[in-house]
């Protein structure tokens, strides 16, 4: 399957020697006619696609002032050139953020600026040809919209917004990406990215109730569609399906149980993720978000809490109120919406949770900041809270914690390599190459600090790492959910773990 | 789109070899698909594939990894009820590779 070379992992993250066009062949599968049409786009490339693309570009620059400013303001200073994980992993100069932006910018200049209209060669303006469209399709699907480059740009140019606009333009001409568009369609028809029907979801949750009771002796509930519950939990559907995601879900449920919370999941809003953002489509992003509002109203909840999902939290924190607000029907004394880590950290601070950190002593943890949480949102009520909350929770439940190189964490975090709609098998090469900077930083703390596991708070990060880190000699089970660590250390009232700790279980346990 | 020929019938598959019309699936297709990946399906593989079929017929989706490992563990013993065993059988991932052979839709999303 893998007919590419895995880059060599070195001691430090270095700037590679350029290999022009080395990733020009990378392109995701094109969306089928029905995937396109379900989202309101033409089923295949329209005949007058050049005109449609330019009209769309014009429409976008009038709708988003930022887009116009980003296209105009680059001075080619070069600060961004070595900041993209895909450039560092592929050596392809078109994966330098400035070069990626220029794929769109050169067309913008040709058709929308005076200099570009009359002296195109002088200002790097180019006609919109089929070759340019192919380049767009290839290289705008080698950007995970992680926004690391924008942190280092003196003008604050956000490549993610340019990449989103490019994808919106490509959708408008009928050249969409199968992975994202098929998935958004599933959200509309089934309720989640996975295509998990309500009956299957109920079956998974029942199974988890059995498992947790077997493990702990406590009947922890995983409620579904409970009208009148206080809290609606919206979490990525991967939490119902994949490993280690599902261990995180068990953690949320145990925390809710132990704090006596009244909570529920919803079959119609059984997905926190919103790929509408990845394809730059305000309309689809809004339609996906509306399910959450509708479910909250229908169930009559007072609060909405989001599970461990990176881009969902960016949307929830930064855009949800604009997209589908106002949320005046929710209890205004809680954050709207709230992150599960804010909830859990709040309870840990109050002291409502009994923790036995020794349960996690077989591990030394590090933490991967997810791009959309780190650079597109916040937790708590102060800047940087999104960096502290996950670390606070991990340190509250684990004795051994080490941070990775600060050049690769917090606002400078590297993307996992699978974000922004690239987490698909047809893009495995770019995913494996894109994880290189994170793998390098991880290897360093593994070798020098004895780190054994890396925790994450995003379904995409968790899946991407479990699939791609093995290319660099790590194992799948070295990736854990933050709430999995909480789950392991939490000593629930009336549990077997409590009895064992307090010596009231009647067994003669030696340890 | 590509197609698989089997016993004089043509079966349409997508870019990754997944059956397009899932109602067409017949057991013989599994080995034909496995041939492409140099895999020989044994009884051990078929224990998994049969469970996938049963689960799919009831729930219209592949089972979660945890549901699958639990079911296999119950049937074949605890030592086999883990993802390590499943990855030995299906090195490209039990969720995706086994689903393909069993004629189930590919799990999509953040998995």
Annotate each predicted stretch with a short phrase.
Chain A
Residues 336, 340, 346-395:
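C-terminal amphipathic alpha-helical segment
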Residues 61-71, 101, 105-323, 503-510:
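Iron-sulfur-cluster electron-transfer modules
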Residues 82-110, 151-170, 378-381, 421-435, ...:
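Iron-sulfur (Fe-S) cluster-binding segments and ferredoxin-like electron-carrier domains
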């Amino acid at each position: 399957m893998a007919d590419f070379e895995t880059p060599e992992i070195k001691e430090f993250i270095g700037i590679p020697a350029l290999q022009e066009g080395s990733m020009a062949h990378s392109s995701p599968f094109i969306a089928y006619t029905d995937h396109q049409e379900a989202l309101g786009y033409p089923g295949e490339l329209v005949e007058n696609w050049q005109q449609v693309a330019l009209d769309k570009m014009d429409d976008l620059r009038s709708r988003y002032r930022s887009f116009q400013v980003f296209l105009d303001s680059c001075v080619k200073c070069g600060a961004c050139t070595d900041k993209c994980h895909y450039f560092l992993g592929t050596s392809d100069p078109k994966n330098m953020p400035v070069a990626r932006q220029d794929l769109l910018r050169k067309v913008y200049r040709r058709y929308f600026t005076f200099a570009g209209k009359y002296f195109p060669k002088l200002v790097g303006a180019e006609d919109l040809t089929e070759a340019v469209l192919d380049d767009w399709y290839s290289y705008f699907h080698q950007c995970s919209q992680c926004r690391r480059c924008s942190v280092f740009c003196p003008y604050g140019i956000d490549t993610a917004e340019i990449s989103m606009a490019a994808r919106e333009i490509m959708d408008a001409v009928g050249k969409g990406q199968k992975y994202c568009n098929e998935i958004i369609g599933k959200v509309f028809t089934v309720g989640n990215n996975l295509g998990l029907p309500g009956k299957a979801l109920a079956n998974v949750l029942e199974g988890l109730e059995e498992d947790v009771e077997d493990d702990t002796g406590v009947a922890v509930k995983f409620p579904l569609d409970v009208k009148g519950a206080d809290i609606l939990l919206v979490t990525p559907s991967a939490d119902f399906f994949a490993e280690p995601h599902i261990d995180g879900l068990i953690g949320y449920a145990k925390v809710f149980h132990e704090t006596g919370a009244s909570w529920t999941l919803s079959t119609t809003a059984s997905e926190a993720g919103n790929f509408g953002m990845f394809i730059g489509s305000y309309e689809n992003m809004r339609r996906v978000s509306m399910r959450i509002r509708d479910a909250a109203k229908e169930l009559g909840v007072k609060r909405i809490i989001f599970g461990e999902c990176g881009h969902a939290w960016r949307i929830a924190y930064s855009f949800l109120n604009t997209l589908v607000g106002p949320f005046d029907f929710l209890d205004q004394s809680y954050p709207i919406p709230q992150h599960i880590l804010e909830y859990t950290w709040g309870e840990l601070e109050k002291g409502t949770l009994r923790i036995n950190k020794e349960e996690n002593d077989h591990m030394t943890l590090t933490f991967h900041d997810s791009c959309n949480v780190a650079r597109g949102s916040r937790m708590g009520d102060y800047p940087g809270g999104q960096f502290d909350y996950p670390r606070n929770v991990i340190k509250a439940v684990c004795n051994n914690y080490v941070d990775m190189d600060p050049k690769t964490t917090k606002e400078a975090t590297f993307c996992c390599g699978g974000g922004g709609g690239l987490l698909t098998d047809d893009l495995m090469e770019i995913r494996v190459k894109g994880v290189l900077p994170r793998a390098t930083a991880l290897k360093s703390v593994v070798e020098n600090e004895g780190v054994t596991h890396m925790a994450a708070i995003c379904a995409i990060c968790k899946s991407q790492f479990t699939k791609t880190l093995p290319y660099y000699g790590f194992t799948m089970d070295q990736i854990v959910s933050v709430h999995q660590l909480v789950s392991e250390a939490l000593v629930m009232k009336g549990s077997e773990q409590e009895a064992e700790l307090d010596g009231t279980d009647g067994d003669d346990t030696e340890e | 789109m590509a197609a698989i020929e089997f016993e004089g019938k043509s079966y349409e598959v997508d870019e990754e070899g997944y059956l397009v019309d899932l109602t067409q699936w017949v057991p013989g297709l599994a080995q034909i698909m496995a041939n492409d990946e140099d895999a020989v399906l044994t009884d051990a593989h078929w224990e998994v594939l049969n469970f996938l079929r049963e689960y799919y017929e009831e729930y219209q989706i592949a089972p979660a990894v945890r549901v699958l490992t639990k079911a296999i563990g119950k049937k074949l013993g605890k030592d086999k009820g883990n993802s390590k065993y499943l990855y030995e059988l299906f090195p490209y991932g039990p969720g995706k590779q086994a689903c393909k052979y069993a004629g189930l839709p590919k799990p999509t999303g953040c998995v």
